[in-house]
Design a protein with these regions (language model features):
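Conserved donor nucleotide-binding strand/loop of the catalytic core
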Residues: 85-88, 99-131, 182, 188, ...
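Catalytic donor/gating beta->alpha subdomain of glycosyltransferases that bind UDP-sugars
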Residues: 107, 158-191, 224, 228, ...
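A conserved acidic beta->alpha catalytic loop
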Residues: 81, 91-100, 117, 144
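Short aromatic/hydrophobic "clamp" motif used to bind/position activated sugar donors
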Residues: 137
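Membrane-embedded multi-pass helical conduit in multi-pass membrane proteins
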Residues: 37, 42, 49, 253, ...
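N-terminal membrane-anchoring/stem segments of glycan-assembly enzymes
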Residues: 1-51, 199
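Long helical/loop segments within the catalytic core of UDP-sugar-dependent glycosyltransferases
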Residues: 122-124, 130, 148-226, 358, ...
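Short, acidic, metal-binding catalytic loop of nucleotide-sugar glycosyltransferases
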Residues: 73-84
């Protein structure tokens, strides 16, 4: 049987598709497998001890009248010596009853720091640090609830003098079983696995902004458009110290239930991370920063290239689908993936549960957010202030409720 030789175009299309697929495979499967192996070969144990340093819990808030009272009650009930813990609410010029509610907790030792103008969360945190007195600074959000022993667990790693920052475990609660919530929970389970591996062998490259602690002497004043979740770990690394993961220090928070809220949040976070990567590009030098640079490049830079790899794979397989059988099937498979995303989008609007289809739906949503964030970064758009996400379904979860939802 005569086999028609492939043209240069089809050979290029196959090469592009295979390269894109291989890169995505490494990003999502190869990197976790590599980190898992390396973390068991080059393990760096953290020395922990039951210490009780003086801590300052700094709670960032903007128009949080619905949740701030519950957050403060939760914080006051934490199992930590009250004379060793101060609580400061950093209000970013709230216009609702947030400040009034916080003042009501004044007799219980809660301090309100109010910004005279709205400068954003990062600036509010910087200024709250200036009026704090703790040796350990613990940063939280108004919608995040801590388990009773969370502070005791998170500070014990500071017995190790090589540790400058500790990230707790954030558990997302999907109370409404929404498609976005299920996808977020699955994604976060994957991220926590990576955190465990990265921490075992060295240092994290990011923390959860609502649950991390840092030595006062290591805290860096960040620019208003920087995202502390990512930048703090880089700052700590540049000081020669580690950021480690403490999974026993648990906080819980409700997931977003609407795709538009999750999309908006992801665009903002990714855009700010891209800006931070550009500002801290010296940390991407593998000759100087070795494994930390490798983690940054793979876990962040390559991860955010996913939408471009998806586009390249789709175009390449579509271009040669008429000439190469296996590319035709690959093209159909990709169309099916995006079809599932459409089903998820429609299902969310119709309040239909889509079960396991939530994962591909969330994958496409986050990939689209990465693309939009890249374009915003390209055009120089910055985020300093933003509106907190409000959802009638979001209620403050208790740690007990969240326990069964940890993914």
């Amino acid at each position: 049987m005569f086999v028609q030789p492939q043209t240069t175009e089809t050979l290029i299309a196959q090469a592009v598709f295979i390269t894109a697929l291989a890169m995505m495979g490494f990003i999502y499967a190869g990197y976790p497998a590599l980190m898992f192996a390396l973390s068991h070969i080059f393990r760096r144990p953290v020395r922990r001890d039951d210490i009780t340093p003086r801590v300052s819990v700094i709670i960032a808030a903007y128009n949080e009248e619905r949740d701030i009272a519950a957050k403060l009650k939760n914080t006051l009930e934490l199992d930590y010596p009250r004379d060793r813990m101060e609580i400061i609410v950093a209000s970013d010029c709230s216009t609702d009853r947030t400040d009034e509610i916080v003042r009501g907790f004044g007799p219980k030792g809660v301090t309100l720091y109010r910004q005279p103008e709205r400068f954003g969360k990062t600036i509010a945190q910087n200024r709250a640090v200036n009026v704090s007195s703790g040796d350990i600074l613990i940063f939280s959000d108004a919608t995040t609830m801590y388990e009773p022993d969370a502070i005791r667990k998170i500070v014990r790693s500071f017995a190790d003098h090589e540790v400058g920052c500790v990230a707790g475990q954030l558990i997302y609660v999907d109370a409404s079983s929404s498609a976005v919530g299920k996808g977020c929970s699955s994604y976060w389970g994957y991220e926590k696995f990576l955190k465990s591996c990265e921490s075992r062998m060295g240092s994290l490259i990011g923390v959860s902004g609502c649950m991390y602690a840092v030595r006062r002497i290591c805290h860096a004043r960040l620019a208003g458009d920087m995202i502390d979740d990512f930048v703090i770990a880089t700052e700590i690394h540049l000081q020669g110290l580690r950021t480690v993961y403490e999974p026993e220090a648990v906080a819980v928070e409700d997931t977003n239930h609407r795709s538009k809220d999750e999309f908006r949040m992801r665009v903002r976070v990714i855009k700010q991370t891209l800006s931070a990567l550009r500002r801290y590009r010296q940390a991407l030098n593998p000759f100087e920063h070795k494994m930390f640079a490798f983690q940054m490049i793979t876990h962040k830079v390559l991860r955010y290239s996913i939408p471009f790899l998806l586009i390249a794979a789709l175009i390449a397989s579509g271009w040669a689908s008429g000439a190469v059988d296996w590319l035709r099937f690959a093209f159909i498979g990709q169309l099916a993936l995006y079809g599932v995303a459409v089903v998820g989008f429609v299902g969310e609007r119709l309040k239909i549960k889509i079960g396991p289809l939530a994962i591909p739906y969330y994958f496409v949503l986050v990939s689209a957010a990465s693309l939009v964030a890249f374009l915003k970064a390209l055009y120089g758009e910055t985020y300093i202030v933003w509106e907190p996400i409000r959802d009638a379904h979001n209620v403050n979860p208790s740690p007990e409720t969240a326990a069964s939802h940890d993914s």
